[in-house]
């Protein structure tokens, strides 16, 4: 079965407070993560919460990267969804974890838009 895209959900632990709480640093890291993965950036928006935390999204031609940080816990939730075969979402995840000086990253990949091939559909419907 063919998929339309790859969606990596990453739990990033042991990150530096000062990075996770700096909206400009998080924005720069996420934009560079998209570029490192070979994506084409369309636009991005990031928000700094009070007293701490950052959320943001980078819209790419191939889909998106999204992040939510909990600096007080040294934790970030990262979401990287890419369509097609040109961009590797794992490259973006690994880049972010490295730039956050993460102690650990646990991640899983989900295939999105699983599509049956026409010949598979015909056989399945008989």
UniProtKB/Swiss-Prot annotation:
- Active-site residues (renumbered): 63, 68, 83
Provide the E.C. number(s) assigned to this enzyme: 4.1.1.50
Q: Identify the pathway.
A: Amine and polyamine biosynthesis; S-adenosylmethioninamine biosynthesis; S-adenosylmethioninamine from S-adenosyl-L-methionine: step 1/1
One Pfam match = AdoMet_dc
Q: Which reaction does it catalyse?
A: S-adenosyl-L-methionine + H(+) = S-adenosyl 3-(methylsulfanyl)propylamine + CO2
Lyase as a keyword of this entry, yes or no, is yes
Q: Which GO terms describe its molecular function?
A: adenosylmethionine decarboxylase activity
The residues annotated as site (Cleavage (non-hydrolytic)) are 62-63
Would the keyword Lyase be found if you checked this record's keyword annotation? yes
Q: Which residues carry this modification: Pyruvic acid (Ser)?
A: 63
Offer one example of a GO biological process linked to this entry.
spermidine biosynthetic process
Instruction: Give the InterPro entries listed for this entry.
Output: AdoMetDC_C, AdoMetDC_fam_prok, AdoMetDC_N, S-AdoMet_deCO2ase_core, S-AdoMet_deCOase_pro-enz
Name of the top EC class for this enzyme: lyase
> What's in the GO CC field?
cytosol
What does this protein need as cofactor? pyruvate
Q: Which NCBIfam families match?
A: SAM_DCase_Bsu
This protein's name: S-adenosylmethionine decarboxylase proenzyme
| Provenance organism | Syntrophomonas wolfei subsp. wolfei (strain DSM 2245B / Goettingen)
């Amino acid at each position: 079965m063919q998929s339309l895209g790859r969606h990596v959900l990453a739990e990033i632990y042991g990150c530096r407070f000062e990075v996770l709480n700096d909206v400009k640093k998080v924005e720069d890291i996420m934009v560079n993560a998209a570029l490192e993965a070979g994506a084409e950036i369309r636009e991005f928006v990031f928000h700094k919460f009070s007293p701490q935390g950052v959320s943001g999204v980078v819209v790419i031609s191939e889909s998106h990267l999204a992040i939510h940080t909990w600096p007080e816990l040294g934790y970030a939730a990262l979401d990287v969804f890419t369509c097609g075969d040109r961009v590797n979402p794992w490259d973006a995840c690994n880049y972010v974890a490295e730039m956050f000086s993460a102690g650990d990253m646990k991640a899983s990949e989900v295939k999105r838009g699983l599509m049956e091939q026409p010949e598979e559909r015909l056989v399945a419907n008989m």
